From Swiss-Prot:
Residue positions binding Mg(2+) 1: E175, D217
Family per record: Belongs to the archaeal DnaG primase family.
Lineage: Archaea, Methanobacteriati, Methanobacteriota, Methanomada group, Methanococci
Chain positions recorded as Mg(2+) 2 binding sites: D217, D219
Catalytic reactions on record: ssDNA + n NTP = ssDNA/pppN(pN)n-1 hybrid + (n-1) diphosphate
Name this polypeptide is given: DNA primase DnaG
Native source organism of the sequence: Methanococcus vannielii (strain ATCC 35089 / DSM 1224 / JCM 13029 / OCM 148 / SB)
Any one Gene Ontology molecular-function term assigned to this protein's record: metal ion binding
Cofactor notes: Binds two Mg(2+) per subunit.
One Pfam family of this chain: Toprim
PROSITE patterns: TOPRIM
Domain Toprim: 169-243
EC annotation from Swiss-Prot or TrEMBL: 2.7.7.101
A GO cellular component entry from the record: primosome complex
Length: 443
């Protein structure tokens, strides 16, 4: 169906009480609607002028009856289209057979087009956003291309290096080409790559002429290359990437931080690299002579200083030890005394009230509370107890068949010295208050 300028589509269903063919249906549509309306809505004239489209008929004959689905495109306005649709329902015969026609639906094709436009526009926008290159990405791409152009080759081994390698007073030795590019991204143009674990002769020679920093990965491979560099080159400073990271995978901020934190080679070489230094023809004569006296002086000074400190502060240390021992002894005695006091109070509690166990047995599994005022025992529900709590003062003893919570303690701490409950759930206990669980009393 060529929709063209179609605005609406009229879907019609026809049932004929006999066998008919397509041309019979189309003839009935044009023949039985002719003259019903004004000439402006005559189907033949409308079709000639293109106001309505080609009428499609899908026909099926079943058991002596004919069933047709008729589709009629219309570019008329909604009022004229509605009149035209209603006109089709006036058809009552097709060929020699009686027929009934019902309008199934009038579809506004523009709604479908709008929905299609919306979905398609959404899809196109998503594609544009995916394909759109951010300004930052463009900038970085241009910078990257310039940096790639800036990378040079040095020496007979064609080692990758930055453009300032010849003119700079200092150089940075890295592992590979990718590391040189990474440093170029950070604006560092005096790096040169070893390109392998075997240090080229060019690196050995240039390290003697310039202030040299070895900047290696923070992994086992980086450590091996560093050892190789220390054996063969005149290294002045050492810097490592963060532990477990490679130089090429390190951010600009981290690289700058690592290079600022570079340490002199004298500080790196100790027991760990002693055998390397001893076998290094470059470092053995110059560096070891510089490091060894300084190291011996530091160790000797530390030993002397330690002996002097021991002589000066030994009496004070001994006195302090005696004081600490006394404090520990006093704390132990205090703890023992507290334990005795608690045990004594438990004993007094049992004696004073003619068997506290019996009191607790009386309220166990009842949900009631029992308290003693002036030697008189009183039993209430907890709700009733709370109602009269303002009138109750100076209790000798309070027991409840419920857990003792912080709220209960805050409520009763100034009314009784002893509180007993099924269990104690308190985070902060007042100094003068004793808390016991049923199990502690019943033991």
């Amino acid at each position: 169906m060529d929709l063209g300028t179609t605005k609406y589509i009229i879907y019609t269903e026809l049932i004929a009480d006999g066998y008919v063919e397509k041309h019979d249906v189309i003839g009935a549509i044009f023949g039985q609607t002719e003259g019903l309306l004004s000439t402006e809505l005559d189907l033949r004239d409308l079709q000639k002028s293109g106001r309505i489209g080609r009428i499609d008929v899908e026909l099926e004959n079943v058991n002596g009856k004919s069933f047709a689905k008729i589709t009629l495109p219309s570019s008329l306005d909604k009022v004229e289209t509605s009149i035209l649709a209603a006109t089709l329902e006036t058809i009552d015969r097709v060929g020699p057979c009686f027929a009934t026609v019902k309008i199934a639906n009038v579809e506004d094709i523009r709604v479908s087009k709008r929905q299609y436009i919306t979905n398609r526009a959404r899809h196109i926008l998503r594609q544009l956003m995916d394909e759109m290159v951010d300004t930052y990405e463009i900038t970085e791409e241009i910078k990257e291309s310039l940096r790639t152009e800036e990378i040079m080759e040095y020496g007979p081994e064609n080692l990758p290096c930055g453009p300032n390698i010849l003119h700079s007073d200092s150089i940075i030795i890295v592992e590979g080409r990718a590391d040189v590019l990474t440093l170029l991204r950070c604006g560092i143009k005096n790096a040169i790559a070893v390109e392998g674990t075997s240090v080229p002769k060019t690196i050995m020679e240039i390290s003697k002429k310039k202030t040299t920093t070895a900047f290696t990965d923070g992994d086992r491979g980086g450590e091996l290359i560093l050892k190789e560099l220390l054996q063969t080159c005149d290294i002045d400073y050492v810097s490592r990437a963060p532990y477990g990271k490679e130089v090429e995978g390190t951010s600009k901020k981290e690289i700058m931080k690592c290079l600022r934190a570079k340490v002199p080679v004298e500080q790196i070489i100790g027991e760990k690299y002693k055998n390397i230094v001893e076998s290094n023809p470059v470092l053995n004569e110059e560096l070891v002579e510089k490091i060894t006296p300084k190291y011996i002086e530091e160790v000797t000074h530390s030993s002397k200083e330690k002996n002097e400190l021991e002589k000066t502060f030994k009496p004070e240390i001994e006195k302090e030890t005696v004081v600490i021992e006394k404090i520990k002894s006093f704390e132990k005695k205090t703890i023992d005394a507290d334990e005795k006091t608690i045990l004594q109070e438990n004993s007094n509690l049992e004696k004073k009230y003619n068997g506290v166990k019996e009191i607790l047995e009386g309220i166990k599994n009842t949900g009631l509370v029992k308290f003693v005022v002036d030697g008189k025992e009183k039993t209430n529900s907890f709700k009733e107890f709370l109602t009269n709590i303002q009138e109750i003062k100076n209790m000798d003893f309070f027991a409840a068949d419920m857990p003792i919570t912080q709220k209960i303690v805050d409520l009763l701490h100034d009314k009784t010295p002893i509180i007993v409950g099924t269990e104690i759930k308190v985070t902060k206990k007042p100094v003068n208050l004793r808390l016991f669980s049923f199990d502690e009393i019943m033991e």
